[in-house]
Amino acid sequence: MATPQGWLFFALFDGRNCAEIENDGMFQLPFHPAVSGWLERRFGGPTEVQAQAWAVTAQRRHALIAAPTGSGKTLAAFLSAIDELVREGLAQGLADEVHVLYVSPLKALSNDIRKNLQEPLAGVRAGLLAMGLPDVGIRDAVRTGDTPAAERERMRRAPPHILVTT
């Protein structure tokens, strides 16, 4: 669905139906303090897109976000996942399996996505350590058709928790 520049389309899916939603303006970050602390230190708070997305994902509901470039869509998707990994890691440790799969249409975009994951992962890790909590060891990787066999084998033996692929 194409949307005019500057217009936000946000939809909730219940499996069959799609309905536009509105945010009532009242929002608190639904994240672990290490996650919300990184976001607040780095950006001062969420964008409108992120606030609306996180209000939905905090309820474990599916969402489709269409918004202009630079509005925070990628972080809106990934920070919820990072938060869940942090909480699970602290509670019981992270299983050696892929928890988050991001499928990209382009190899170059896959590499950009992974690069953009490094800052929040490092920031959350630092936040955990500053709180006296252990690093939960979230691993991420990119796998494309160009990924060498040795690296693929490493991923098989110790799967990344976040896998970006084409």
Question: What are these model-predicted stretches?
Answer:
Residues 2-3:
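Targeting/processing segments of secretory and organellar proteins
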Residues 36, 46-165:
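Conserved P-loop/Walker A NTP-binding site and adjacent catalytic elements of P-loop NTPases
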Residues 8-49, 62, 129-133:
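Helicase-associated low-complexity/disordered flanking segments
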